[in-house]
From Swiss-Prot:
The gene is rplD. It comes from Acholeplasma laidlawii (strain PG-8A). Belongs to the universal ribosomal protein uL4 family. Residues 60-71 have a biased composition (Basic residues). Residues 47-78 are annotated as: Disordered. InterPro entries: Ribosomal_uL4, Ribosomal_uL4-like, Ribosomal_uL4_dom_sf. Part of the 50S ribosomal subunit. This is Large ribosomal subunit protein uL4. SUPFAM superfamilies: Ribosomal protein L4.
Length: 207
């Protein structure tokens, strides 16, 4: 059972917390992580690429020349694919790139991502994080107190507006509501910060 130090936002150690072994202490499943991250990245694609077929290109209703007697190859439309400005054959059409992922697989991927950060000693526990005003310097002060890397994601049980605004100016740091974070985001950041509320959420949802 992994045991981590619990800090306050001033960077002072409060106590030690024993985390649930079934969530934070499993052996990360690399194949599941690969599959789920690929699926989540695919779902982010807009899928709006579109080309026009010969039926959709403007013009081309009239036969360019008569069928026989000219010595040239027969043509039915100046918008046929072989013509300059003609329609595209088998071009992209709007589609969804989303891939179905089973709920149990998603949960295993979340557990694997969290356990990976525990093994890498990149998981930080904080009792709570709040800022009195929506100022970036207050959030930077908290990050410095906790000795956080520039590329860190902070997971809270509910996002405070001041905290969200205070972190928006930092390109490498992100504050997310724990219920909204993806496996891809968890793995993209070097350090993961969990509040006690976020840990409780995972223990309720993933067990």
């Amino acid at each position: 059972m992994p045991t981590l130090n619990l800090f306050n936002q001033a960077g002072e150690k409060i106590s030690e917390v024993a985390l649930n072994d079934a969530i934070f202490g499993i052996t990360p499943n690399q194949q599941v992580l690969y599959d789920v991250v690929n699926a989540q990245r695919a779902a982010l694609r807009q899928g709006t690429a579109k080309t026009k077929t010969r039926a959709e290109v403007r013009g081309g209703g009239k036969k360019p020349w008569r069928q026989k007697g000219t010595g040239r190859a027969r043509q039915g439309s100046i918008r046929s694919p072989q013509w300059r400005g003609g329609g595209i054959v088998f071009g992209p059409i709007p589609r969804s790139y989303a891939v179905k992922v089973n709920q149990k697989v998603k949960q295993l991927a979340l557990k694997s991502a969290l356990s990976y950060h525990v093994l890498a000693e990149n998981l930080v526990l904080v009792d709570n994080i709040t800022v009195a005003e929506p100022k970036t310097k207050l959030f930077i002060e908290i990050m410095n107190n906790l000795k956080l890397d520039d590329r860190s994601i902070v997971l809270v049980d509910s996002v405070d507006k001041n905290l969200l605004l205070a972190s928006n100016n930092l390109p490498g740091a992100v504050v997310r509501e724990v219920s909204q974070v993806s496996v891809y985001e968890l793995l993209k950041f070097k350090q993961v910060v969990l509040t006690q509320g976020a840990v409780k959420y995972y223990e309720e949802v993933l067990v």
